[in-house]
Amino acid sequence: EFRRVLFRSNLLQVLFNMSDVAVVGRFAGSTALGSVGSTSIFVTLFTGFLIGLSNGINVLVARFYGARHADDVEKTVHSALLVSLAAGVLLLLIGLLGSPALLHLLNTKEDLYPGAVLYLRVYFLGMPALALYNYGNAIFSAIGETKKPLYYLCIAGVLNILLNLFFVIICHLDVAGVALASAISQCVSAFLVLRALTHVQDCYALDFHKVALDPATTQRILALGLPAGFQNAVFAIANLFIQAGVNSFDSLMVKGNSAAANADNMIYDAMAAFYMACASFMSQNYGAGKPDRVKKSYFIALAYSFGVGLVLGGSLFIFGRQFLALFTTEGAVIDAGMKRVGVMGFAYCISAFMDCTIAASRGLGKTVVPTVIVVLGSCVFRVIWVYTIFAHFHTIPSLYLLYPCSWTLTAIAEIVYFIHAYKDSMKIFTQPQPAEA
């Protein structure tokens, strides 16, 4: 049930986010679609960092809650609020001040540039709220309560769709309209999840009078959350080079890529629900002293995430043209998008072996080495690929093939490390207990 609710939550979040692109593509034209799509890497970069930070909060709360350390849970909840808020405000400032420079780095097409800058600046107004929603969602997920965040996500998501239609069709705000709708809906979801935390009767309840940074707890949050956030950011940083490669083609290819890339978020986030469940369950069972359930949690999560990636990716491969038609009515843009779909359709499931294993290592408290492996296998490898293989062939397939290749390479290294980390972590349960005097 825990995994199913997380799956629905992640899938709904992606579908609501896709409504931005669908509304702007269908009602504001392909140029607006390309403008929004040109910002997706930066949105993924910064939101991915916040999600990684919240994963650290999730693991720490789950461990303390599983071990019944109520005081530590309380300290984590109140310290994490300030950490999350600070991260959201920092990203807001970066988005407002740095958007033009960031888009110039990617050689964004001139006809797409003004709309892309406007979208980023308005969208980033909701970053503090997004950070607070992820904070609340992480805490509820850590203790096994996933339905409340799902309900709040539904409310905010429906509001997002209605505001998208209102701002774009009625107010003719186009790019600014969908960004503003996202920011408002993020504020609503943050308010609802924080309000719910203040009304619970347990050690994870939020009391604004107790909000303070406990130094030791904050250090633990950052030790778990920053590597996870950095890992997510690394993927986005590497993808900046990929987006620059896409931008080296004409605007038509950029627009087609923008439409097809929505499938990445839909499928990957659906799979990510099982990664969070894996880390949370492994951390809880490890903290509760139940080693038999630790390994079982990993294999179940791996099987589910692989299956979801295979089914959704295969469906995308078969119904790709119908999927792309949700975002544009132009046949040439759909044809361009199908070039990405043709390569990626059956590649998504490969990433399960990498990401689920990383989540499992994090659930055992191992964060540094998995992050280093991701940096080498995903970031460094992808950059090398862009400047060698893609530079040689300069075709769209030669660019997109780096995804499954980097996932495979990184997965092998992560699995080898996890086997070692698992054996080392389980020693605590096999060591003989000292005899009583």
Where is each model-derived feature located?
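Transmembrane helical elements of multi-pass membrane transporters/channels
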Residues: 8-20, 122, 156, 185-189, ...
